[in-house]
Every structure is written in structure tokens, then in C-alpha cells.
Amino acid sequence: NTDQVVAVAFEYTHGGQTYQVGEFAGDRTNVSEALFVKSLKNTSNSPSQGNWNLMMKNVYRLGDTVEKERFRLDVKYQSDTTGVYLSYIPEEQVKKQTIIKLLGADRLDNNNRPNSNGYFDYVEGYTVSNGRVFFPEPEPFGRDLYRLLVAKGVPSAVAQKYVFNELYDNTRTAAKQMAEKDKYNLVGQFRGSS
């Protein structure tokens, strides 16, 4: 929601040294004093904001709840030549692999065993949570897709035509205006409950 903010305080250990980012409420005795925390989302979703690069742009909302039963999610790409939505990138080096598998989001079967089944992996709390799906890469249709395509042998200039970087460095409204890049659709079916 645009009127909500998200901030965190956390500790982590690196090289045997413990670091703290922000302040914990439990460390304070005076509850009327402000806490210093790390902002992850503010009310202004603008690329010029300092936290823009920290935002989770690999998260897509499906609905209020999503149940594993009958969950099927795929990524489709609209072909420039036919206008048809394809489950693969139409380049020789990668056309035998579905987009969802190329993006690393189809590694498991329906029983969460290592064997892709052609659909987005449903792992409660990890890839699917609170009606949202989480792709494994921060920019699945941007720089991460470019890196994956080039690693599979797609020439750099050719890979660039499939990349939608504007989805990650512009607002959603601005990115939707770029019809020549807005060619990906999440399609599928799921059951939800309230």
C-alpha cells in the first residue's frame, strides 16, 4: 500500500564480528523516543529515493491467499513476430527451456523434490507467501534475465531485446507505457481461501 512504510532493525555476523543496523525497541527504556531503523519502503515510490534499489521488485501479488492445491503459474513472452504468448524465449540457445525454468523458478515437482514440472515452484513461506509469489532473482525480467540468456550463449545484443530493465528503474506506471518491452505475463490458476 502506498500509505504504508516498512523499516527494519537487524543484527548480522560477518567474519566473526556482530553488526547491528538500526535500534531495537527492547533496547530502549523511554518508549516516547524515536527509534532509528533502516527504511525499506517509504510512501514515495520513486526511483530517485535512496531505498529504490532495496525494494523487492521480484515479488508479484496474486490475491489474498493462495493454496498449493491446483497451483499452476507460468511466465509467457509475447512474440514480436506472431503476437502469440510463448512459454519460452524464441532463441535457438534457450527455446527448449521454459522461461519459468530459465529464471530458476521451476526446480521442483509437486512434492517439492528436485525435478522440474513446468510450473512455478510452490514452497509455502519461501516462494509463495500471503498471496504473493517471489522469484529467486531480484530482477527476473531485467539484468538477471540478461545474465542468464548470455550465459546460455545468446549474443549480448540479442539478449538485450528480451530484457525489461525499465520495470526495475521506473515506476510501474512509467514501465507499463513501454509496450515494446512490456511483453511478459504471469498466467496460471490457483485456489484461494479467506
Language-model segments: residues:
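Surface-exposed, low-hydrophobicity segments enriched in Gly/Pro/acidic/Ser residues
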Residues: 1-194
